[in-house]
Design a protein with these regions (language model features):
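Single conserved hydrophobic/aromatic residue that forms the stacking wall/gate
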Residues: 1-7, 11
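Conserved N-terminal Rossmann-fold NAD(P) cofactor-binding segment
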Residues: 9-53, 57-75, 94-102, 390
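Hydrophobic beta-strand scaffold residues
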Residues: 12, 37, 105-107, 261, ...
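Rossmann-fold dinucleotide-binding core
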Residues: 64-69, 82-83, 87-200, 208-236, ...
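Glycine-centered, small-residue-biased loops immediately flanking beta-strands
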Residues: 79
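Interdomain hinge/lid region at the active-site interface
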Residues: 164, 189, 194-197, 201, ...
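Small-residue-rich helix-loop
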Residues: 205-206, 328-362
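C-terminal amphipathic alpha-helical interaction region
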Residues: 381, 386-455
Length: 455
């Protein structure tokens, strides 16, 4: 079920998975709307005006290809197919070319918003056959959420699989953001001794400032939620986090494109280790009497807020750097400022600071690492002492904060003008003759040393 508002256009729905779903939908939630339901695919296609626009909401993978093959015989040249699932961007690029050969226009549209977005409007990231954009723009922008200034959270991303790539990076940032919030909760609880009620109020207060976001807002709600017997539900949820794969895809693509993506990789790895519940319980038992906490300096809630904000900036810096690298690699010409604006509403990572991020990219010519933008570098400098203090405290307390630590180490590496990679390159040349550049030579000129002969 997707957004069912009072559209000016007619809508036809068809379900090929479970018989009767379309009928129940039309008679239920869609009652009174301009929506027709069909169980026969040929009748469904025949009911649409040309050029036909069909949006497919199916599981990523073979199901998309199968549906394309099923519906294509009933379509005509110039008809549009939109894949609104979480497809791999490489698959989308392949489908764009295959559909073009059939005379069809294929669009891969990343959609973020969850169940709420399905009813109230989502952030929609379309890409693929550019000729389809004038045809589908009114429909998708009507379906999309609207930012506070009324701008639809939907615009054209680029050719091939650009739309699904942007959605994949969105999900990677989402993984990072959620892990940072979880570590904040864990640190406040384990090292700070703050109960759920106080923590809920704290997140609620943060949601009134620069951390204002959907994820911070719902965290406040979750921490305050009690069951009928007065117990907090969050304390009764098993500490095992699931995932659907887009976070892993983003890390894999960052590796392939040579981008630093450590914070988001740690977020994925933490979900992985969370599933090893029995192993963790056994390890906790084995080491319980041996893990001694060191004396530590206390931290304030304000210092934790600074740590969360600075680390959040790193998550976005890594995500947008990956978008920038992909744009250059694939010739997509992604508009990073526009992407930031498009994520201001509907999507899971919507947050107040995206307006500032969009303005920073516009001022910076649309490229650059956001950690270097004046709008954010001043805030990072101010947060740095607290950031270091909070991470050090967590280490001394034995509280796992891998995303916070990764973010801080990324910052330290980014701001170090000479890293120990010179030794790594020397080792590579020693055992594999992989050559090296010299500090007293030209960039791009490589040397090899016969290390053994010098001994």
């Amino acid at each position: 079920e997707i957004t069912c508002r009072d559209w000016s256009s007619d809508v036809c729905s068809s379900d090929l998975v479970e018989e009767g779903v379309a009928e129940r939908f039309v008679e239920g939630r869609a009652a009174g709307k301009q929506i027709l339901g069909f169980s026969d695919l040929s009748e469904f296609v025949a009911s649409l005006n040309r050029p036909r626009i069909i949006m497919m909401m199916v599981r990523a993978g073979n199901a998309v290809d199968e549906l394309i093959d099923q519906v294509s015989p009933f379509l005509a040249e110039g008809d549009v197919l939109i894949d609104g699932g979480n497809s791999d961007y490489m698959d989308t690029g392949r489908r764009v070319a295959a559909c073009r050969a059939r005379g069809l226009l294929f669009v891969g549209a990343g959609v973020s918003g969850g169940a709420e977005g399905a009813l109230r409007g989502a952030s929609i990231m379309p890409g693929g056959a550019k000729e389809a954009w004038p045809l589908i723009r009114p429909l998708l922008q009507d379906m999309a959420a609207k930012a506070a200034d009324g701008t639809p959270c939907c615009d054209w991303m680029g050719p091939d699989g650009a739309g699904h790539f942007v959605k994949m990076v969105h999900n990677g940032i989402e993984y990072g953001d959620m892990q940072l919030i979880a570590e904040t909760y864990f640190l406040l609880k384990r090292a700070g001794g703050i109960d759920n009620e106080r923590m809920s109020r704290l997140f609620g207060r943060w949601n009134e400032g620069r951390l204002k976001s959907y994820l911070v807002e719902i965290t406040s709600d979750i921490l305050a939620y009690k069951e009928a017997d007065g117990g907090y539900l969050v304390d009764r949820i098993l500490d095992v986090a699931g995932q659907k794969g887009t976070g892993q895809w983003s890390v894999k693509n960052a590796l392939e494109l040579g981008e630093s993506f450590g914070l988001i990789a740690e977020a994925v790895f933490q979900r992985n280790i969370s599933t090893q519940k029995e192993l963790r319980v056994e390890a906790a038992r084995v080491y319980a009497s041996r893990l001694e906490k060191e004396p530590y300096a206390s931290f304030s809630a304000d210092e934790v807020e600074q740590t969360l904000f600075a680390s959040k900036l790193v998550a976005y810096a890594q995500g947008f750097d990956l978008l920038s690298r992909a744009s250059e690699q694939f010739g997509w010409n992604l508009d990073l400022a526009m992407i930031a604006r498009m994520w201001r509403g509907g999507c899971i990572i919507r947050s107040a600071f995206l307006d500032e991020l969009a303005r920073a990219y516009e001022a910076g010519g649309g490229r650059g690492n956001l950690m270097l933008f004046p709008a954010f570098s001043t805030q990072v400098r101010e947060a740095l002492p607290a950031w270091r203090r909070v991470v050090a405290t967590a280490v001394c307390e034995g509280v796992a904060v891998p995303a916070f630590a990764s973010a801080l180490n990324y910052f330290h590496s980014l701001t170090t003008d000479f890293l120990p990679a010179n030794l790594i390159q020397a080792q590579r040349d020693y055992f594999g003759a992989h050559t090296f550049e010299r500090t007293d030579g030209e960039r791009g000129k490589f040397y090899h040393e016969e290390w053994v002969s010098l001994q």
